[in-house]
A protein has these predicted regions:
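Short alpha-helical segments enriched in small residues
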Residues: 1-188
């Protein structure tokens, strides 16, 4: 379900990545693969796009992406810090320079005490650079998910535009002996 607006955003993002030798990864929950689909709909996406993890279930956020289990227990899966840890985890797990993550409630029912339209998008990049945005989106389930994709692409592009040129093409982790970003990565 691509729209001209997000399709153009994905193409522009990938052109910048290709020009600068940057790789990307995606972690998705509420968007369920839509963000990765937008990116891979662009011809040549494989030059920059490492892959995606669709961690729809809460235990996958912990076990695959390394989101802290106590954070999930205390705040639930729909939380800004969860989104940040998802982005950092997929960046580490897939060996990308930059990553973006989505989590939230598309509706029609509330989840984890959050109303439909509550969405968090986060980016993670080199040297600990990250940002999380809290969104209150309106519309149908499809409209909320599509808007979240657009917001994620916009946030990631803004960070890539602002990144120092010397950071291009740096793989994570900067130190290959570095531990996973969160202690729960790989715990069962």
């Amino acid at each position: 379900m691509t729209t001209q607006n997000t399709d153009g955003a994905a193409a522009g993002l990938l052109a910048l990545c290709d020009e600068r030798g940057i790789t990307l990864a995606v972690a998705e929950s509420l968007t369920g693969g839509l963000l990765a689909a937008e990116i891979t709909a662009v011809p040549g996406a494989s030059q920059a796009f490492r892959g995606a993890v669709i961690a729809y279930a809460t235990d996958l956020k912990r076990d695959v992406l390394g989101v802290d289990s106590s954070l999930l227990a205390q705040r639930g899966a729909v939380d800004g810090e969860v989104a940040r840890q998802m982005a950092a985890g997929v960046r580490w797990r897939l060996g990308a320079d930059w990553a973006v993550a989505t989590t939230g409630v598309a509706g029609p029912d509330p989840q984890d005490g959050q109303q439909p339209g509550t969405v968090f998008v986060a980016v993670a990049g080199p040297e600990g650079r990250s940002e999380t945005r809290s969104l209150n989106l309106t519309g149908s389930r499809t409209e909320i998910r599509t808007a979240a994709v657009g917001e994620a692409l916009t946030l990631l592009r803004r960070h890539l535009d602002a990144a120092p040129k010397g950071q291009d093409g740096r793989k994570y982790p900067e130190n290959p002996d570095q531990e996973a970003p969160y202690s729960s990565l790989g715990e069962r």
